[in-house]
């Protein structure tokens, strides 16, 4: 059963989400309704919605993370209705009966209150569910509440997710693969950020054969495919079939640290672990990643190509082959700070490190970037010095390419600044900012931190 403290934490976050909805004057009030309500409302209600303004029913369901079936059950007396003593006097003053919610989510009336949570109601029994194939006749399966959103309808085993648990540890506990866990709990997401604490996850479906259990807690059972390589569990989702070496990802580890340890490139790692994603956002902690495949020969660290230049590892993806100078990107570095340090242009930097992208969004921390190539003569590292154009206005540096020459007011962009924030501060429009600073683009995705932005002209 969800503790009252956790329940209220969940309610608080849900109330914020609902309060942010357009025109949301209807709000989750608390443990007592302010408006009249249906006399058949469940006595187990722990949170109410005071419906003071018309809102789509589906928006109400989404904001409160409930299903239509639960909503109808709670407001129409689907459970026992023994009165709760603390609400007796309140109920006597609200005798008007609200209409029942229909099967197509209609029937809500402005000025009424509706139950949107019954945290302690008895666990209902799910209807028997059967698999799509001929795997026998299943019996009645009880589904505990609350569950993760969108669990498999034919689930027959459940795990109550505890605070701090992740998809990898749960998969390991039950001897299932990451792919199976995701298929049965799709709302968890490939990066497991959608997994809810204090809610039940599906860890088996009808017809699934779980690993044999002992008197002790189940342990991950390595699998031995036809190639003879034992695969430990759980693995990252969708790793390659011909993997012959594995690494258990620790909490806080990134792709760059792993590739450096095993002398492989970032491109190889993401090819063998595609669910990790090009920016490593899908890497799971406490799950095994593939760090070698059959026939792979690991690179020595560092490498010395035919040009005689040692290349440290790991590098940014797809850096040029003729690089002769490298910089280890630190957390918080931007393309602007790096090019300023080495006296190179942004054009050169993105040419040598193409995966960084024009907006620098693809730059990886803790990986080496190329800051010079064979035959390139760098400019002396300049000291930022204000320039004085013919209009007499000094322009601070650094600035983004293409800024207008008649600017007379500048704003230094800090981390976290956005175009709307800057617009409000200087009372200018987005069209003005884009016209004066074309590099930021019409949707402001090209705005760079630690550079000066034009916010006024002559």
Swiss-Prot record:
Region annotation Disordered: where it falls in the sequence: 210-232
Q: Which UniProt keywords apply?
A: Chitin-binding, Repeat, Secreted, Signal, Virulence
Q: Which GO terms describe its molecular function?
A: chitin binding
Q: Where in the cell is it found?
A: Secreted
Asked if Repeat is a keyword of the record, the answer is yes
Query: For this UniProt entry, which residues form the secretion signal?
Result: 1-19
- Where the record annotates domain LysM, the positions are 157-203, 245-291, 325-371, 409-455
What role is this protein assigned? Might have a role in sequestration of chitin oligosaccharides (breakdown products of fungal cell walls that are released during invasion and act as triggers of host immunity) to dampen host defense.
In Swiss-Prot or TrEMBL terms, this protein is called LysM domain-containing protein ARB_05157
Give the source species.
Answer: Arthroderma benhamiae (strain ATCC MYA-4681 / CBS 112371) (Trichophyton mentagrophytes)
């Amino acid at each position: 059963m969800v503790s009252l403290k956790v329940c209220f934490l969940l309610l608080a976050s849900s109330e914020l989400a609902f309060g942010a909805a357009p025109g949301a004057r209807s709000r989750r009030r608390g443990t007592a309704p302010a408006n009249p309500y249906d006399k058949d409302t469940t006595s187990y209600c722990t949170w109410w919605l005071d419906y003071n303004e018309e809102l789509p029913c589906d928006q109400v369901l989404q904001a409160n993370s409930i299903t239509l079936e639960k909503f109808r059950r709670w407001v129409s007396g689907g459970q026992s209705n023994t009165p709760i003593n603390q609400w007796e006097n309140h109920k006597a003053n609200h005798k008007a009966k609200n209409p029942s919610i229909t099967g197509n989510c209609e029937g809500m009336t402005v000025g009424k209150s509706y139950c949107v949570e019954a945290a302690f109601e008895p666990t209902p029994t799910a209807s028997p569910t059967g698999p799509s194939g001929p795997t026998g006749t299943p019996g009645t399966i009880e589904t505990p509440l609350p569950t993760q959103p969108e669990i498999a309808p034919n689930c027959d085993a459940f795990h109550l997710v505890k605070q701090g648990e992740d998809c990898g540890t749960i998969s390991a506990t039950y001897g299932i693969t990451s792919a199976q866990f995701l298929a049965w709990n799709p709302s968890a997401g490939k990066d497991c950020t959608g997994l809810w604490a204090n809610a039940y996850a599906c860890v088996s479906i009808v017809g699934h054969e779980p690993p044999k259990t002992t008197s002790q807690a189940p342990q991950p059972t390595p699998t031995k495919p036809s190639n003879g390589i034992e695969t430990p569990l759980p693995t990252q989702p969708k790793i390659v079939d011909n993997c012959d070496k594995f690494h258990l990802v620790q909490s806080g580890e990134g792709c760059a640290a792993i590739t450096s340890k095993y002398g492989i490139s970032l491109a190889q790692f993401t090819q063998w672990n595609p669910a990790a994603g090009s920016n490593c956002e899908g890497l799971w902690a406490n799950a095994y990643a593939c760090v070698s495949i059959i026939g792979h020969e690991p690179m020595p660290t560092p490498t010395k190509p035919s040009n005689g230049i040692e290349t440290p590892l790991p590098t940014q993806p797809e850096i040029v082959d003729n690089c002769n100078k490298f910089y280890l990107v630190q957390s918080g570095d931007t393309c602007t700070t790096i090019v300023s340090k080495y006296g190179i242009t942004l054009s050169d930097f993105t040419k040598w490190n193409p995966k960084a992208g024009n907006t620098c969004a693809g730059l990886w921390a803790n990986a080496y970037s190329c800051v010079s190539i064979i035959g390139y003569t760098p400019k002396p590292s300049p000291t930022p010095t204000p320039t004085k154009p013919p209009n007499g206005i000094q322009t601070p540096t650094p600035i983004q390419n293409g800024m207008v020459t008649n600017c007379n007011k500048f704003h230094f962009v800090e981390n976290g600044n956005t175009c709307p924030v800057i617009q409000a501060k200087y009372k200018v429009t987005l069209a003005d900012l884009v016209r004066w600073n074309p590099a930021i683009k019409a949707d402001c995705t090209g705005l760079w931190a630690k550079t000066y932005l034009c916010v006024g002209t002559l």
